[in-house]
UniProtKB/Swiss-Prot annotation:
GO terms for cellular component: cytosol. Belongs to the NAD-dependent DNA ligase family. LigA subfamily. Its EC number is 6.5.1.2. It comes from Methylococcus capsulatus (strain ATCC 33009 / NCIMB 11132 / Bath). The keyword Cell inner membrane does not apply. Its cofactor is Mg(2+); Mn(2+). GO terms for biological process: DNA repair; DNA replication. This is DNA ligase.
């Protein structure tokens, strides 16, 4: 029958597209599509050629294994072709493979060697008289690249074999890969040095092995597992694949500790499921399982098709990377007020589930990856890890795509967003009002060191918020017996006890109240200092930056947090409601007689001849001064004895007055500066 013109054109386009991606993957180590997308393209072309055999051409990607080697390396022609494997994407595919093999061998059941499919770079190692003499990459399966100088730098690969029972000349084959821990450390070093990071361990392994300078390869955390042989004298072949692996291991070539001999399709699937459950606990990346007929004579009888052995198959795990489009970027507010950008994605099946969102972590991460709404991106999902965007495909970005900017106000409550210089996290400042922070702000408000509301535990707060009985801390004081008694495990007695505890908590101190508000960086000590310094809530709420900086222990950052918190109308409204509900405290007692050095901050450095540092500190504190361990713009004087440290330099830098020992003694005698 004649082939429809549209099918001929489709096959031509598929061949061109697959060849293009072969070059990107094998020659440039810079793939534009995921393995799953590549497999789909190849499967589509195979299906067309199976239906219309006349469309098969000598240069079709289905008739070869990969792309030609790069020109920077010497070419090596493999004595035995390094073929790729057919893929099984489902249990049905694997069962069909087992059925076909058993039929061709006329056997009721077969044993297979099952082992992890490592995600690295395949290499062929030639040993003569037990010494490694040549190493080559797979290349296009027929011709690879000579990487002997680099493979010698991979510590897991022996330069000389162990024992004496190995053949005089043979080839071992295996996978060079980069363990997860080494990959993370390598990328961290690259980030610190401002260098380009690798997308995944496979790219890192390939890039490391194909360096012209072997010293670079030696610095990379590469490893190796052998999985088979190339050229090998027939007379020395063992009977089975697993005995061959045992021989390789005995000669010093590492093999996967995860390989097993399994029986039939059922044994293969049991191994596949078991390894799939543990794959993320393994120290290296895998993307499936390889099954090989264990009987080597049976392997020889089954032979090969044009691009793969008929006695082996790769059973792929669901793809963990996929390509999709960013529909938009939303900003979520966490329970502590941290703003996290999240990419909304066109639904894509990856890692066994359909993914519609991916975390972008923070503004710095968005800038580093340059993710923009409308971008085409590669998404990764590994196990239970939240899906993340690995990288953007810049070639597919539409003109005029605008960079994303974090909002200046909270998307949940409209309060101002604060982000300190040097910090990657942005936070909502509407702690008392923001719906996203309700539970945490209420739990903190009720805690023992804050308002000390006995009986109001975390689970009860979850119930109250979940049933919409309370939304802010002020709502606690509007609860009644009927609503409380209707909660889980809350009878009338427990409800009455909680109401009594709420009533008691209304009588507090200004320091406790300030701490209970949950102002960022205002802990118990700072709250106490603020209450003593300002004396009233009103004075603190209206304090200027200069007035706040005059308070000991309050620097520019804490001052900014305090002013921003009280500047939010929502926070002020909740505070007004709390006061209207009866929360109160006694006015601070009149300040005691002012001491001569009260309000002054001293820093001691060096050694004093006339007294110890503890004695000097005690003398200063007796006159009302405060002694601290570091110099800041709030420091009034630095007292410098002999052999002063870096504090003296800091004082000079900030313009803080310095007293020598004589000046210090004069000050103590006068009792004033």
């Amino acid at each position: 029958m004649s082939v429809p013109a549209e099918v001929v054109e489709k096959a031509r386009k598929l061949r061109e597209e697959i060849e293009f991606h072969n070059v990107r993957y094998y020659r440039l180590d810079d793939p534009l599509i995921t393995d799953a997308e590549y497999d789909r393209l190849m499967a589509e072309l195979l299906a067309i050629e199976a239906r219309y055999p006349e469309l098969v051409t000598p240069d079709s990607p289905t008739q070869r294994v990969g792309a030609p080697p790069v020109e920077a390396f010497t070419e090596v022609r493999h004595e035995v072709p390094m073929l790729s494997l057919e893929n099984a994407f489902s249990e049905e595919d694997l069962t069909a493979f087992d059925r076909r093999v058993r039929k061709e061998l006329s056997r009721d059941t077969l044993e297979y060697v099952a082992e992890p499919k490592l995600d690295g770079l395949a290499v062929n190692l030639l040993y003569q008289d037990g010494v490694l003499v040549r190493a080559a990459t797979r290349g296009d399966g027929e011709v690879g690249e000579d990487v002997t100088h680099n493979v010698r730098a991979v510590r897991a690969i022996p330069l000389r074999l162990k024992g004496e029972d190995f053949p005089d000349r043979f080839e071992a084959r295996g996978e060079v890969f980069m363990p997860k821990r080494g990959f993370l450390a390598l990328n961290e070093r690259a980030r610190r040095s401002g260098e380009k990071t690798f997308v995944n361990p496979r790219n890192a392994a390939a890039g490391s092995l194909r360096q012209l300078d072997a010293r670079v390869t030696a610095s990379r955390p590469l490893s190796f597992y052998a999985y088979g042989i190339g050229a090998f004298p027939d007379a020395r072949l063992p009977a089975t694949q697993h005995e061959l692996l045992e021989s390789l291991q005995r000669w010093g070539l590492p093999v996967s500790p995860e390989y097993r001999v399994v029986r039939g399709a059922a044994g293969c699937l049991e191994y596949y499921r078991s390894l799939g459950e543990r794959r993320h606990d393994l120290p290296y990346d895998i993307d499936g399982v390889v099954y090989k007929v264990d009987d080597l004579k049976a392997q020889a009888g089954l032979g090969f098709v044009s691009r793969a052995p008929r006695w082996a198959i790769a059973h792929k795990f669901p793809a963990e990377e996929a390509r999709t489009r960013v529909v938009g970027i939303d900003v979520q507010v966490g329970r502590t007020g941290v703003l996290t950008p999240v990419a909304r994605l066109e639904p894509v099946f990856v890692g066994g589930v359909t993914v519609t969102n991916a975390t972008l972590h923070n503004a710095d991460e968005i800038r580093r990856k340059d993710v923009r709404p409308g971008d085409t991106v590669i998404v990764r999902r590994a196990g239970d890890v939240i899906p993340e965007i690995v990288r953007v495909v810049p070639e597919l970005r539409k003109p005029g795509a605008e960079p994303f900017r974090m909002p200046e106000v909270c998307p949940e409550c409209g309060s101002a967003v604060e982000a300190e210089p040097g910090e990657v996290l942005a936070r909502c400042s509407g702690g008392l009002y923001c719906p996203a922070q309700h539970k945490e702000s209420i739990k903190h408000f009720a805690s023992r060191r804050a308002m000390d509301i006995e009986g109001l535990g975390d689970k009860l707060v979850d119930q109250l918020v979940g049933r919409k009985l309370i939304a802010t801390v002020a709502d606690l004081y509007r609860l009644d017996l009927d609503r409380l008694a209707g909660l889980d495990r809350m009878g009338e007695k427990s409800a009455a006890n909680l109401l009594a505890a709420l009533e008691r908590s209304k009588r507090t101190t200004l320091a406790r109240f300030l701490y209970a508000l949950g102002i960022r960086d205002v802990g118990e000590v700072t709250a106490k200092v603020l209450s003593e310094h300002f004396g009233s809530l009103e004075a603190l709420m209206e304090a200027t930056e200069e007035e706040l900086l005059a308070v000991a222990d309050v620097g520019p950052v804490v001052s900014r947090h305090i002013r921003l918190f009280f500047a939010q109308p929502h926070n002020r409204e909740v505070i007004s409601q709390l006061l209207a509900c009866g929360v109160s405290w006694e006015k601070p007692a009149p300040a005691p007689r002012k001491l001569p050095l009260q309000g002054l901050v001293f820093v001691l450095t060096g050694t004093l001849a006339s007294m110890s540092r503890d004695e000097a500190r005690a003398r200063l504190e007796a006159l009302g001064a405060k002694c601290t361990g570091s110099v800041s713009r709030n420091t009034s004087f630095v007292v410098a004895g002999s052999e002063p440290g870096s504090k003296l330099d800091k004082a000079s830098e900030l313009g803080v007055p310095v007293l020598d020992e004589k000046g210090f003694l004069d000050l103590l005698e006068r009792g004033r500066p």
